[in-house]
Curated annotation (Swiss-Prot):
HAMAP family found in the cross-reference section: Ribosomal_bL28 (MF_00373)
One cellular-component annotation, GO: ribonucleoprotein complex
Protein name according to UniProt: Large ribosomal subunit protein bL28
InterPro entries attached to this UniProt entry: Bacterial_rp_bL28, Ribosomal_bL28, Ribosomal_bL28/bL31-like_sf, Ribosomal_bL28_bact-type, Ribosomal_bL28_sf
Keywords recorded for this protein, A-Z: Ribonucleoprotein, Ribosomal protein
One Pfam family from the record: Ribosomal_L28
Organism taxonomic ancestry: Bacteria, Pseudomonadati, Thermodesulfobacteriota, Desulfovibrionia, Desulfovibrionales
Residues of the signal peptide: none
Family: Belongs to the bacterial ribosomal protein bL28 family.
GO molecular function (one): structural constituent of ribosome
GO biological process, one term: translation
Length: 70
């Protein structure tokens, strides 16, 4: 499963775990991705993976909720 934001392209970064003895082992810092339904400019509603920064900045347009038929 790809860990890349569909809007900004943010992906995993590499770094080190550092123990108290200063031993270093490689690790990956993953972006905080959320699966969210968004409305594309064409009007189509699609589910994408977006990082929380894109969601908070307003780059993700939430679709208008459908009204229940009664």
């Amino acid at each position: 499963m790809s860990q890349v934001c569909d809007i900004c392209g943010k992906g995993p970064q590499t770094g080190n775990n550092v123990s108290h003895a200063h031993n270093k082992t490689k690790r990956r810092f993953m972006p905080n991705l959320q699966k969210v339904r968004t409305q594309l400019p064409s009007g189509e509603v699609k589910s994408i993976k977006a990082c929380t920064r894109c969601i908070r900045s307003g780059a993700v347009v939430k679709p208008v909720a459908k009204k229940a038929v009664s």
